[in-house]
Amino acid sequence: LKRRKFLRYNFPLTNYYTYVIKMNNRFNTEVPPLKGSKPIYAKKANLKAKWTYNSKDNINGYTDPISKTKIEMIKNIEKLYILLKKNNIKMSLAVYPWPQTLENDTVDSQHVKMWEEFCLNKCEKFINFFPYFFNEKKESSHLNVLREFYFWNDVHFNKKGNIFLGEKLADVF
């Protein structure tokens, strides 16, 4: 742990490339294959996404109830809002689905509702990307949307996904 902290703070690039090599499936057989018939996400990512589509307040693997966690998230964004307002900076907020959310949730996600409600009378703009992705899913399939817009086995957008989001943001602004 000490070595990792030392590397992280004193040699960030070395630390990053050590991580990349460690996670590269040519060197680590624990990493899922780059392309399978269905993506395999890290357990932590699956757990992190679960609250958005799970109706239970207590989810196995979470330390606190979801209701408490939501309050914490809102408090943190509220602090950001106050800081921005104090500096005369307008706040806009965008929400988009993670792959797990896209697979297991609906366009009217509690995730969307929570941030939309927060943005009332606070945000310059609230940008909801859920309808775009759920529409794409409806027109093709969940897996096709993942292949087209996300890195496989990852919750992040690929180049095409980022271009897609950028074009939608350009339309809004």
Language-model region placement:
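Serine-dependent acyl-ester chemistry module
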Residues: 1-117, 124, 129-140
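Flexible, active-site-adjacent loop/turn segments at secondary-structure boundaries
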Residues: 100, 131, 148-149, 155
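Histidine-centered active-site loop/cap adjacent to the catalytic His
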Residues: 149-173
